[in-house]
């Protein structure tokens, strides 16, 4: 299979699935060769989906029923607050959310970093994850605890020091097999590929977004969207005005502690307007994606409705339950 990749020929879904299972047993040299060759060739939606499906199938099993996940690939180098995690907390007031994530990739606060700064225990067992979904509609799936098949691959990936297919697989590798997803990507070229990969994985409804350089919906500029609905894919663009909001700038974030402080302020209802809009538009898209909001403006209203004492109390419940 390595020769095929070096010759710039694409793999089928099945071949990509098999390749992941080969890599987990390969030597470091051959793992590096495969990853570098695949990165040089570029990967298709079938290859992305094949790897993601193999990651899910090799992961520790986690049956949580129909859940939503909101996640981004990272890698946009924008150093924003962790919007997808803030949105996940808001969304847990309306639906079951299983947030799959890790420590920071390129931002200053990955989902795991933020949740720890908010006082939430991220290193929980599958049994605890199920209990949290049932009791508070939210759980965090800390990726390193659920993907033992990556044990040999990850050190090689780190040693290589270049981007590989694993840089974009995180949002697709949730072992809870979410029925609904909002996926942010760091390149407009990835929007269609990730949408088609989600189709291969059998998602019910999903949106893939790229916001003018952000792996989120931009509160300032145009965002490209691929909407996946039971096999169909529609492509369109949205702006903050479509959400009924004025355009606001993205304020950089410099640490998990700062991200937690600013997000907590948004959840309390007294955060900076720029942070508030950023969180609201991304929450609104997720509420629209799962069918709770009929349009984006209603999504903003629903997200706004839970800000304040209600969501702060919920955050405390999540933190307490995660440690019990």
From Swiss-Prot:
Which GO BP terms apply?
A: L-tryptophan biosynthetic process
What pathway does the UniProt record associate with this protein? Amino-acid biosynthesis; L-tryptophan biosynthesis; L-tryptophan from chorismate: step 2/5
Q: Which GO terms describe its molecular function?
A: anthranilate phosphoribosyltransferase activity; magnesium ion binding
Specify which residues bind anthranilate 2 according to the UniProt entry for this protein.
157
Q: Which cofactor does it need?
A: Mg(2+)
What EC identifiers does the entry list?
A: 2.4.2.18
Q: Tell me any Pfam family this protein matches.
A: Glycos_transf_3
Q: Which UniProt keywords apply?
A: Amino-acid biosynthesis, Aromatic amino acid biosynthesis, Glycosyltransferase, Magnesium, Metal-binding, Transferase, Tryptophan biosynthesis
Q: What does this protein do?
A: Catalyzes the transfer of the phosphoribosyl group of 5-phosphorylribose-1-pyrophosphate (PRPP) to anthranilate to yield N-(5'-phosphoribosyl)-anthranilate (PRA).
- Entry similarity comment: Belongs to the anthranilate phosphoribosyltransferase family.
Listed name of the protein: Anthranilate phosphoribosyltransferase
User: Which species?
Assistant: Pyrococcus furiosus (strain ATCC 43587 / DSM 3638 / JCM 8422 / Vc1)
Lineage per the UniProt record: Archaea, Methanobacteriati, Methanobacteriota, Thermococci, Thermococcales
Q: Which gene encodes it?
A: trpD
């Amino acid at each position: 299979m390595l020769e095929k990749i070096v010759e710039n020929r694409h793999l089928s879904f099945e071949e990509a699935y098999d390749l992941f299972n080969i890599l987990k047993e390969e030597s470091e040299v051959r793992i590096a060769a495969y990853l570098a060759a695949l990165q040089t060739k570029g990967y298709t939606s079938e290859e992305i989906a094949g790897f993601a499906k193999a990651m899910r199938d090799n992961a520790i099993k986690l049956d949580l029923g129909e859940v939503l996940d909101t996640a981004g690939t990272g890698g946009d180098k924008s150093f924003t607050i962790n919007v997808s995690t803030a949105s996940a907390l808001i969304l847990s007031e309306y639906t079951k959310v299983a947030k799959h994530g890790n420590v920071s990739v390129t931002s200053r606060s990955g989902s795991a970093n933020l949740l720890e700064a908010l006082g939430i225990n991220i290193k929980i067992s599958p049994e605890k994850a199920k209990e949290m979904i049932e009791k508070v509609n939210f759980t965090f799936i800390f990726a390193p605890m659920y993907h033992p098949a990556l044990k040999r691959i990850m050190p090689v990936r780190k040693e290589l020091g270049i981007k590989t297919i694993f840089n974009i697989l995180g949002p697709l590798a949730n072992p809870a097999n979410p029925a609904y997803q909002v996926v942010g990507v760091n390149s407009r070229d990835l929007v269609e590929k990730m949408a088609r990969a989600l189709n291969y994985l059998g998602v019910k409804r999903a949106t893939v977004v790229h916001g003018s350089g952000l792996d989120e919906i931009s509160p300032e500029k145009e965002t490209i969207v691929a909407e996946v609905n039971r096999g169909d894919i529609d492509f369109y663009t949205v702006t903050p005005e479509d959400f009924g909001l004025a355009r606001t700038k993205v304020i950089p974030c410099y640490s998990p502690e700062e991200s937690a402080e600013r997000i907590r302020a948004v959840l309390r209802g007294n955060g900076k307007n720029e942070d508030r809009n950023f969180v609201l538009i991304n929450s609104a898209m997720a509420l629209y994606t799962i069918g709770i909001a009929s349009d984006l403006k209603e999504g903003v209203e629903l997200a706004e409705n839970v800000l304040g004492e209600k969501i702060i109390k919920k955050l405390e419940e999540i933190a307490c339950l995660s440690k019990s």
